Amino acid sequence: MIINHNLSAVNAHRSLKFNELAVDKTMKALSSGMRINSAADDASGLAVSEKLRTQVNGLRQAERNTEDGMSFIQTAEGFLEQTSNIIQRIRVLAIQTSNGIYSNEDRQLVQVEVSALVDEVDRIASQAEFNKFKLFEGQFARGSRVASMWFHMGPNQNQRERFYIGTMTSKALKLVKADGRPIAISSPGEANDVIGLADAALTKIMKQRADMGAYYNRLEYTAKGLMGAYENMQASESRIRDADMAEEVVSLTTKQILVQSGTAMLAQANMKPNSVLKLLQQI
């Protein structure tokens, strides 16, 4: 029987200390809901989890970018539909005045409407905007360098595409003459020429709208793909980083029992020197 070193108490204290640390770690996992709260918990798991988290955040933003692109195209296509309707009306008036039964006075009255419609084409081109960007004044035509028209549709560098919108002013659509005056229908011959000009303008608009429709569908498929990738990537990160709550509760219960028993055993070990004291009292 010795008194200078209480090895039982030392061993009990060591076990108690480690079990208390384990309880703290388990409680941290339960309170945060995450198995990995620091690199010390799982260094390799944390590294993989952080890479996955980077991709998850990037995919989520890329999906939003794609939806913004879809909104942009919808807005532009809506304005372009108005322009198309206006030119359809100009074409009808041109066909009407190509008929020789109308007097010069009649043609002048029709010309007033044609001129107003041409002005409306320019009004739409000047006022059609998305986030203060002019849509139809050539800012997004091929050859321009507007960085804002790059749609970034992926979580990584260079995963982007550019969309082009042609100039849709009356000048670009050839609805005005070289001197800036609107196209004229002052004679059956001029009215007949306007039919051809209207057809050419409508062809340009229809091609642009077809491009918009195709690109919109592409963005829609891209958004669906990004949503699927986002969900799968997030599930992968969750499996690595998140805590299994049922497993952690079982672990906490076990470790708490060990702490309680360790505390009791430490108390018992600290009682050993008292036995020596009682022995000495009997001398």
UniProtKB/Swiss-Prot annotation:
It is found in: Periplasmic flagellum; Periplasm. GO terms for molecular function: structural molecule activity. One of its GO terms (cellular component) is periplasmic flagellum. The keyword Transcription regulation does not apply. Keywords: Bacterial flagellum, Periplasm. InterPro entries: Flagellin (IPR001492), Flagellin_C (IPR046358), Flagellin_C_sub2 (IPR042187), Flagellin_N (IPR001029). Pfam families: Flagellin_C, Flagellin_N. Its main location: periplasm. This is Flagellar filament 35 kDa core protein. It comes from the Bacteria. Belongs to the bacterial flagellin family. The flagellum consists of two outer layers around a core that contains several antigenically related polypeptides. It comes from Leptospira interrogans serogroup Icterohaemorrhagiae serovar copenhageni (strain Fiocruz L1-130). The keyword Transferase does not apply. Component of the core of the flagella.
